[in-house]
């Protein structure tokens, strides 16, 4: 008797189409197109996991710069002052502090100003 790929092929296609749920047109219905689209989406996902890190760092720096300008400093001066003062806060926590804890951020800025003046 001739054997076919029946069950195995069905499972394989089912797995593919499950991953392609929500894709429009042939990208969600046609096996070859689905495979190509999934490969491409995987490549984008891989790339963008790295891009995300860059984007967030940029956002934190922009926020810190805006907050620091209100206290009469520039971002580069502020970071230099932080390092000189030995304050080990990362950019993420500094940006959160600038948004949610203005008083605490002001204290950090004052400490940096003292360190830079000395």
Swiss-Prot record:
Belongs to the bacterial ribosomal protein bL20 family. It comes from Rhodopirellula baltica (strain DSM 10527 / NCIMB 13988 / SH1). SUPFAM superfamilies: Ribosomal protein L20. One of its GO terms (biological process) is translation. Binds directly to 23S ribosomal RNA and is necessary for the in vitro assembly process of the 50S ribosomal subunit. It is not involved in the protein synthesizing functions of that subunit. CDD domains: Ribosomal_L20 (cd07026). The lineage of its organism: Bacteria, Pseudomonadati, Planctomycetota, Planctomycetia, Pirellulales. Keywords: Ribonucleoprotein, Ribosomal protein, RNA-binding, rRNA-binding. Pfam families: Ribosomal_L20. The gene is rplT. InterPro entries: Ribosomal_bL20, RIBOSOMAL_L20_CS, Ribosomal_protein_bL20_C. GO terms for cellular component: cytosolic large ribosomal subunit. This is Large ribosomal subunit protein bL20. The keyword Ubl conjugation does not apply. PROSITE patterns: RIBOSOMAL_L20. GO terms for molecular function: rRNA binding; structural constituent of ribosome.
């Amino acid at each position: 008797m001739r054997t076919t790929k029946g069950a195995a092929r069905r499972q394989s296609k089912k797995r593919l189409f499950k991953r392609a749920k929500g894709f429009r047109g042939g990208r969600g219905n046609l096996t070859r197109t689905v495979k190509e689209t999934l490969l491409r989406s995987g490549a984008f996902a891989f790339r963008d996991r790295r891009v995300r890190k860059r984007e967030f760092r940029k956002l934190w720096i922009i926020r810190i710069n805006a907050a620091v300008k209100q206290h009469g400093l520039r971002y580069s001066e502020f970071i230099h002052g932080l390092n000189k003062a030995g304050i080990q806060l990362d950019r993420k926590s500094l940006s959160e502090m600038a948004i949610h804890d203005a008083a605490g951020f002001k204290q950090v800025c004052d400490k940096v100003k003292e360190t830079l003046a000395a």
